[in-house]
């Protein structure tokens, strides 16, 4: 492609005017195009004689192709020289950079030896794309050199060099061809002002303010000054023109001035209500708490605001903030300060000095910090969204005050926003905005439109925003199955999707009822995603981590999207927005879902605490108050989200999610130093949700072993932070079939493009109550280990116990919890019993996985890890295990004997199971056959028998290649009862046309030749065991026995027809009816009935247990025989004799009175003792003995021996009581120094010295308040406080001590047995196979005295903490 610039009109610059030179077109060609270049290096360097990355060589900078680039080597000093072949006049240079260096210059030479600089950049936007137009000043040169002096640093801490898309040169400097106002027509209210902006073409031509002329056709209606600031004087129409002086180049727009449009005031009022709330719930505790939060936060910001005349910042920059992130923080702080100014309960309410500080703060950010609409560095998001939105909110709050007192300031403050958010479709600096980014930018465009009452800005929003509602089949956007993708191929319902909901919801609710309301039919796509991708996706009010991308690595309360509950709270706020304009049925579903989630999570999470704004809080209150909690109904759902390789099944007991990736979907996103260890989060990770709400929530991602995530098959080799981020798999077989009740899910795991050679075929068969996990074809080598992680579950050791058992075929492990609903069982064949089971304690910080959104907290969690280790090398490895939830150990043991399913095949070609009426299969290759199903293509199939001869078959094409896939059914299809339109039938072959289905399933119901059913015949044969030949006449028995023999023959025949079966059943029933019994002598039951009657008087309480058992069994048998019409005389006589014998052996319980006098007396005497007076160990023995004594005393059936034993044990327990020493402790000096140092104030001292002092003072006060503190503790607290006082340093003393932060260390739970080198407890198989009992891994108890001392210490600490808590509470 030849690069040319067509100049329509050329001008010569004279002073501050432009003089026309020519009206004819002149063609100017790029002098550098295809010229010879030399350069210092290429990214990646050389391998032998060749560049590692030939696509980045220097020639690409002058090849005329804007899709190629030169990428310099990673060194500070890098250069590229273009040889023109001869000396040329250079009027202008154009440098288009893919990534700009911080420091570089352009030099020229005529001989290639001596160079002179004509341009130098010393403040380049490191790493950002940019285009520079450089004045050549008609210099004469043959050689032009680009010289980089400094690399730029990425947020991943790596350094990179320049990357040049194109380097161009032209003989003549380009002059303006056209000028265009950015507003095509303007409607403005009376007395309003607006700053007009323009652009000159071609891009890069510099025009100064002095060269521009502004004019109005009617100054009585509109005036415009020479900076383009327009004022609406009165109603009417006029035209405003901008012109380049000395030329005919100009642009004119019509301006209509109208009386104030009340719609603008109404929309600003809606916006303001979101920020300041209403009086509707002023008596509500949560609303009052939020108002108090606003007041507290704003006061703290007011007290820390830097108001110095020569200030360089408003608030000190947070350590974790980048330069650009600090802008977002500063504008957010200004907004919070403004909220305090307008909040009636705040100390800052309507204080003039606060208002003045807010206005001056905004001016400081625009004038001094250059938030001016053109400057930016670092992350584009902070400029266009992060800073723009809180500034817009602030200006909405200030609007009325600014308009009445200083309208010029309103225009000035809005002007940068008009440039940063010029158009909803433009993402800085040169990209097209999509999805959530578009709606976020649109919020600022809408806000500025409302601030300036600019119709065109609202039209921009009205036209641009509905584009996010379109249903897409690739890239960013909404998908028909409920998926939401951002950044091209990452699942993001959780964060970016939520931002889209919020952005669209806020915009639509503000525009609703106005002239600019959005009425786009594609809004139905949004409602569909809200239903499938939010209501059906969320679990217990939590947004699953598997759809939240890199936001899972953020510390709580550092961002709206952090933990699953925090993201869930943000989602609920957004759903309440959508409900305001949703169809009634969806609105009802939203309300029911929210009520259900709040009910499910109970008191574990407070959804009303720290809302994002008043609107979110009030809307949630409205939902809760709209109906009774009884309406809350858990939603059951099963979704295969083929467009984002995610699966979620929800039922009443649990939910399970599966996270995968493929050729279509990325493995994980790492960016801005976030999610540094997300390597394996899509390698088939399984999320099992029950009533354990802490699972996958706060602290989980900071402590979980990132190499061993539940459900994954992994190569555990060490990986660098962010390694292989954004990789898509070489394989596309990921997904599965789903009939709404069960699902057959599979993943072809292939790590070959991530520095590993591991491959595996993984399947999950999701039944109602069972998860069947199969793996096959596991092949790979590593210098670490290859493992399958059955689970790695965060547990509470004091609540969860590890159990195990085995049967002849299968073994099992369970995690039994305090809440039985949280029990989890794992059943696996004995071939899998070489499992590693570990209880592991791990510590970590969010700073370990994210450097952007962090807190200071170190988390420590315990994990139960169950894994199969294949070693360093594995070929065609497999696994099989069943996961169940909410089952007792007895139920899990029973499952190990009868799992309820059969694995039909588990190979690299086919994985299939049969369970009840289902056959489920994932075929990885062509031509696979199992259980009467022949799959011609790789596919996923569920066959369900719904009646005799009636089947529902569900098919899916997980390859998503739009091809047709077929299966042959051996039953012989007689009729198609129902079928989705994408399914066709040809004889017994069923074909799915998968084009456009994105992996989703389709079903068909067919009738086949009915199967021969023998159940009734087999049952009838079984019932005949009671008949005996001696009881019937010979002739009737002959007919019967022949019919029975024939029935058995038919039952055993595999080829018998249904007619033969039915005939055999009929003949056998007839033969049974004709049986004639041999006459029998009348049986006499008189004596039996008499003895039964005589012995009904006996009562169990009067006899010993053993004698009563014999008697009661004999009586029961006698009654049974007496009731039988077929009992023989021998049976009657035997029952009578047995009962008489049982009556004789009855032994009466002794009736001697038990004496409890002494026991009751000693219980009474010892009620005076109090726990606080005795050591913990002695009190434990005493309290248990006292409890047992009281139990025996209360028992009416206690024997004298039991009473005497209880008395003896209690007396012994009383004697061993050990009193706590009561020596008086002297706290005089400690209390004195505390009193003397209450005068100090934090503002007078350096932060580091104050921290040491305040902690010492706090500890001293704690010890002083403790009634159980020892003299040593008192003395130590006093010494520590005296030392801290001495070290206090005044702020003006010049000392600047660096504060150190201590990081957390990963810890492991050590036990007395089975500890490996990492400090984790190994639960290994015993020599007999299976596992040792959990009790074998209990730690050694040590001496009783040591335990006692530990308990005493813990009690002292706990008492102190309680006193401190009460004291701090009273101070508040």
Curated annotation (Swiss-Prot):
Residues 1-25 form the signal peptide. A motif (LPXTG sorting signal) lies at residues 1338-1342. Its EC number is 4.2.2.-. Residues 1288-1336 are annotated as: Disordered. Disruption phenotype: Deletion of the gene in vancomycin-resistant strain V587 leads to significant defects in bladder colonization and in spreading to bloodstream in the mouse model of catheter-associated urinary tract infection (CAUTI). Double deletion of hylA and hylB genes in the same strain leads to a significant colonization defect in both the kidneys and the spleen in the mouse model of bacteremia. CDD domains: GAG_Lyase. Residues 1308-1329 have a biased composition (Polar residues). Residues 1014-1075, 1084-1146, 1155-1217, 1226-1288 form the FIVAR domain. GO terms for biological process: carbohydrate metabolic process. Residues 1342-1372 form a propeptide. Coiled coil: none annotated. Induction: Expression is up-regulated by 5 kDa hyaluronic acid (HA) in vancomycin-resistant strain V587 cultured in human urine. The modification Pentaglycyl murein peptidoglycan amidated threonine is found at residue 1341. It comes from the Bacteria. Residues 63-172 form the F5/8 type C domain. Its main location: secreted. The active site is at residues 487, 496, 550. PANTHER family: HYALURONATE LYASE. Belongs to the polysaccharide lyase 8 family. Has a very modest degradation activity against heparin sodium salt (HS) in vitro. Involved in the pathogenesis of vancomycin-resistant E.faecalis infections. This is Polysaccharide lyase 8 family protein HylA. It comes from Enterococcus faecalis (strain ATCC 700802 / V583).
């Amino acid at each position: 492609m030849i690069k040319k610039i067509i100049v329509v009109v050329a001008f010569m610059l004279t002073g501050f005017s432009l003089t026309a030179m020519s009206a004819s077109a002149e063609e100017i060609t790029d002098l550098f195009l295809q010229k010879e270049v030399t350069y210092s290096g290429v990214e990646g360097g050389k391998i032998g004689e060749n560049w590692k990355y030939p696509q980045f060589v220097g020639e690409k900078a002058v090849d005329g192709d804007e899709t190629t680039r030169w990428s310099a080597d990673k060194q500070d000093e890098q250069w590229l020289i273009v040889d023109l072949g001869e000396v040329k006049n250079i009027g202008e240079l154009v440098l288009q950079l893919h990534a700009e260096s911080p420091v570089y210059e352009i030099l020229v030479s005529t001989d290639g030896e001596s160079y002179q600089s004509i341009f130098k950049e010393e403040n380049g936007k490191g790493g950002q794309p940019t285009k520079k137009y450089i004045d050549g000043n008609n210099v004469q040169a043959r050689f032009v050199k680009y010289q980089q002096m400094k690399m730029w640093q990425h947020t991943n801490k790596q350094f990179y060099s320049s990357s040049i898309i194109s380097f161009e040169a032209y003989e003549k400097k380009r002059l303006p061809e056209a000028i265009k106002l950015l507003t095509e027509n303007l409607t403005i209210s009376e007395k309003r002002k607006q700053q007009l902006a323009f652009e000159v073409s071609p891009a890069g031509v510099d025009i100064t303010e002095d060269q521009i002329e502004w004019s109005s056709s009617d100054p009585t209606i509109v005036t415009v000054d020479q900076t383009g600031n327009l004022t609406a004087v009165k109603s009417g129409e006029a035209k405003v023109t901008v012109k380049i002086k000395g030329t005919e180049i100009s642009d004119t727009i019509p301006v209509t001035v109208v009386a104030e449009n009340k719609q603008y005031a109404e929309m600003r009022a809606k916006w303001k209500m979101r920020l300041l709330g209403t009086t509707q719930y002023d008596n509500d505790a949560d609303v009052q708490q939020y108002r108090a939060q606003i007041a507290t936060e704003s006061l703290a910001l007011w007290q820390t605001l830097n108001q110095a005349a020569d200030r360089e910042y408003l608030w000190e920059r947070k350590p974790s903030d980048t330069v650009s992130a600090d802008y977002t923080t500063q504008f957010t702080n200004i907004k919070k300060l403004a909220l305090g100014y307008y909040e009636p309960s705040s100390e800052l309410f309507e204080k003039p000095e606060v208002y003045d500080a807010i206005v001056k703060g905004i001016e400081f950010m625009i004038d001094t910090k250059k938030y001016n609409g053109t400057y930016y560095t670092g992350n584009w998001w902070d400029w266009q969204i992060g800073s723009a939105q809180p500034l817009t909110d602030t200006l909405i709050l200030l609007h009325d005050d600014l308009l009445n007192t200083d309208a010029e300031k309103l225009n000035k403050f809005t002007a940068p926003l008009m440039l940063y958010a010029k158009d909803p479709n433009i993402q800085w600096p040169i990209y097209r905005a999509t999805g959530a980014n578009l709606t976020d930018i649109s919020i600022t465009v809408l806000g500025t439109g409302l601030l300036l009452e600019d119709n065109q800005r609202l039209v921009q929003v009205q036209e641009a925003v509905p584009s996010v509602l379109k249903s897409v089949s690739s890239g960013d956007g909404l998908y028909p199955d409920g998926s939401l993708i951002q950044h091209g191929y990452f699942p993001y319902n959780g964060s970016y999707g939520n931002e889209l909901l919020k952005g669209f919801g806020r915009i639509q609710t503000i525009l609703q009822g106005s002239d600019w309301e959005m009425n786009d039919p594609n809004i139905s796509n949004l409602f569909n995603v809200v239903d499938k991708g939010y209501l059906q996706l969320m679990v217990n009010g939590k947004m699953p981590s598997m759809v939240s991308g890199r936001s899972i690595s953020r510390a709580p309360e550092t961002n709206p999207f952090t933990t699953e509950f925090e993201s869930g709270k943000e989602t609920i706020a957004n759903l309440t927005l959508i409900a305001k304009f949703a169809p009634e049925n969806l609105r009802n579903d939203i309300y029911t879902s929210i009520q259900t989630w709040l009910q499910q999570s109970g008191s574990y999470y407070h959804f009303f605490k720290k809302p994002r704004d008043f609107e979110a809080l009030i809307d949630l209150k409205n939902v809760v108050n709209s109906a009774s909690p009884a309406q809350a109904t858990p939603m059951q759902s099963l979704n295969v989200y083929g467009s984002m390789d995610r699966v979620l099944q929800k039922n009443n007991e649990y939910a399970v999610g599966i996270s995968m990736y493929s050729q279509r979907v990325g493995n994980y996103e790492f960016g801005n130093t976030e999610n540094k260890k997300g390597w394996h989060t899509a390698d088939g990770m399984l999320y099992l949700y029950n009533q354990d709400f802490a699972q996958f929530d706060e602290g989980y991602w900071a402590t979980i072993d990132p190499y061993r995530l539940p459900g994954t098959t992994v190569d555990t080799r060490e990986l660098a932070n962010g390694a292989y981020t954004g990789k898509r798999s070489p394989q596309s077989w990921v997904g599965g079939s789903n009939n709404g009740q069960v699902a057959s899910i599979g993943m072809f795991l292939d790590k070959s493009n991530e520095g590993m050679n591991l491959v595996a075929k993984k399947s999950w068969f999701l039944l109602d109550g069972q998860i069947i996990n199969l793996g096959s074809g596991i092949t790979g080598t590593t210098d670490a280990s290859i493992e399958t992680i059955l689970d790695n579950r965060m547990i509470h050791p004091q609540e969860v116990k590890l159990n195990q058992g085995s049967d002849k075929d299968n073994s099992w492990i369970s995690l039994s919890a305090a809440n039985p609903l949280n029990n989890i069982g794992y059943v696996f064949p004995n071939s899998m019993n070489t499992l590693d089971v570990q209880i592991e304690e791990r510590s970590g910080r969010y700073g370990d996985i994210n450097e952007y959104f962090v807190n200071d907290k170190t988390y420590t969690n315990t994990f139960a890890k169950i894994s199969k280790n294949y070693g360093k090398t594995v070929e065609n490895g497999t696994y099989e295990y069943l996961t169940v939830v909410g089952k007792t150990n007895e139920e899990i043991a029973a499952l190990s004997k009868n799992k309820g399913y059969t694995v039909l095949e588990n190979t690299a070609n086919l994985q299939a199971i049969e369970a009840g009426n289902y056959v489920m299969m994932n075929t990885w290759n062509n031509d696979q056959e199992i259980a009467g199903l022949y799959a011609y293509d790789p596919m996923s199939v569920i066959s369900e028998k719904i009646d005799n001869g009636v089947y529902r078959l569900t098919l899916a094409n997980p390859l998503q290649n739009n091809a047709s896939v077929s299966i042959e059914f051996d039953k012989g299809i007689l009729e198609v009862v129902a079928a989705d339109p994408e399914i066709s039938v040809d004889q017994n072959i069923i074909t799915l046309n998968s084009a456009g289905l994105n992996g989703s399933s389709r079903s068909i119901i067919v009738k086949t030749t009915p199967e021969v059913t023998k159940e009734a015949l087999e049952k009838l044969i079984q019932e005949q065991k009671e008949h005996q030949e001696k009881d019937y006449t010979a002739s009737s028995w002959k007919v019967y026995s022949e019919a029975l023999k024939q029935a058995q023959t038919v039952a055993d025949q595999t080829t018998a027809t249904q007619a033969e079966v039915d005939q055999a059943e009929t003949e056998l029933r007839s033969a049974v009816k004709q049986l004639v019994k041999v006459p029998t002598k009348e049986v006499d039951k008189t004596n039996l009935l008499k003895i039964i009657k005589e012995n009904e008087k006996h009562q169990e309480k009067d006899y010993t247990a053993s004698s009563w058992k014999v008697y009661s069994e004999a009586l029961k048998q006698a009654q049974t025989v007496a009731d039988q019409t077929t009992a023989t005389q021998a049976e009657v006589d035997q029952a009578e004799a047995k009962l008489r014998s049982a009556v004789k052996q009855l032994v009466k319980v002794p009736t001697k009175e038990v004496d409890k006098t002494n026991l009751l007396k000693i219980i009474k005497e010892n009620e005076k003792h109090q726990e606080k007076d005795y050591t913990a160990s002695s009190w434990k023995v005493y309290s248990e003995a006292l409890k047992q004594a009281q139990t025996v005393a209360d028992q009416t059936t206690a024997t004298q021996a039991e009473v005497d034993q209880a008395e003896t044990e209690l007396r012994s327990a009383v004697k061993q009581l050990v009193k706590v020493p009561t020596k008086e402790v002297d706290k005089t000096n400690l209390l004195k120094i505390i009193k003397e140092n209450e005068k100090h104030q934090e503002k007078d001292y350096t932060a580091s010295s104050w921290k040491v002092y305040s902690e010492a003072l706090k500890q001293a006060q704690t010890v002083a308040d403790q009634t159980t503190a020892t003299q040593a503790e008192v003395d130590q607290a006093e010494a520590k406080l005296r030392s801290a006082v001495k070290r206090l340093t005044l702020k003006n003393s010049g000392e600047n001590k660096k504060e150190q932060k201590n990081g957390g260390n990963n810890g492991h739970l050590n036990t007395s047995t089975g500890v490996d080198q990492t400090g984790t407890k190994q639960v290994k198989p015993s020599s007999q196979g299976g596992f040792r009992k959990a009790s074998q891994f209990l730690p050694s108890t040590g001496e009783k005295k040591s335990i006692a001392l530990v308990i005493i210490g813990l009690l002292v600490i706990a008492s102190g903490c309680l006193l401190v808590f009460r004291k701090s509470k009273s101070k508040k």
